[in-house]
Amino acid sequence: MMQFSLHFFKKETRHVEYNLLRAFFEARDDFEVRIHDDRSAEFIYTHPRLLHQAVFYQTKSSQVPNIYRSDAAFLDINIHLEIPILSPDYFTKEVLLIAEQLANKFDFYIYYEIFEDPIEVDIDFIMTIYENLKKAYIDRHPQ
């Protein structure tokens, strides 16, 4: 199944306090934290009632498509979020609220492959993109 992927960037620095990042997720009961090593981890969100999942990844290398198109002031920090494209809109909005909290706490910007440059989190705008992508996916795969 297709994933809706958002990538996190910082402006003019790659510095991230990864111990604080991991603590952000560990403090939440709705996350399972899987640490692979000091440079990679998975933070798996499970909605308490719907049981749908989304995953925040910390990776060793960039997963951003067409990274060289964006403004050089924004630096990829190798953290991204994947939400299954057929997730309920309510669930997706809940995940985006967590992404917004994360971005605000760590001064992150977000990037989706159709953006020219990373942007500050705008949940309504991102939900519109998600809903349009989801509709297009369903139209192409009606079953």
Description of each model-found segment:
Residues M1-Q143:
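Acidic (Asp/Glu-rich) sequence patches and key acidic residues
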